[in-house]
Amino acid sequence: MAFAEHEVLIPRDAMDVYSFLIDGMNLPQWRTGIRSISLASGPAQTKGAVYRQTVAGRAGLTVAADFEITEARPGAEIRFQTIAGQTRPSGGYYLSTEPAGTRVRFALDYQPKGLLGLMNTGIQRAMKAEVVQLERLKDVLAVRSAA
């Protein structure tokens, strides 16, 4: 099993943060490695929405990493499941209101099967690198609030 999480405090209202995160089209603004993203099916920004995404893989290859929003609780939680690609983690953004803004926790969980289980250390490292990008979200939203 591989698990990674990271959290930041963003000086913005929980609904502002939620509205930005629920829109999959915003991912390239704060997550590196996303080559393309589009809404594949379902209503945008809601439970059931499926986003077609390609990301940078090893050796410069482009890898499918489509995902579906599996839970959407406005101002509180967004969960998703990766549905394409070799590794298919589930994850979520968990928001809580604090006096100084919104605390956001980004968590990823992956249960490797078969031979992928032998690569657990590499998968764990890659997942940690993904969740730490939450620091970039904080910067992006700070700039947006100043504009």
Q: Residue locations for each model-derived region?
A:
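Amphipathic alpha-helical segments that line or abut small-molecule/effector binding pockets
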Residues: 15-18, 131, 135
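Beta-strand/loop substructures that line and gate deep hydrophobic ligand-binding cavities in soluble
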Residues: 81-132, 139
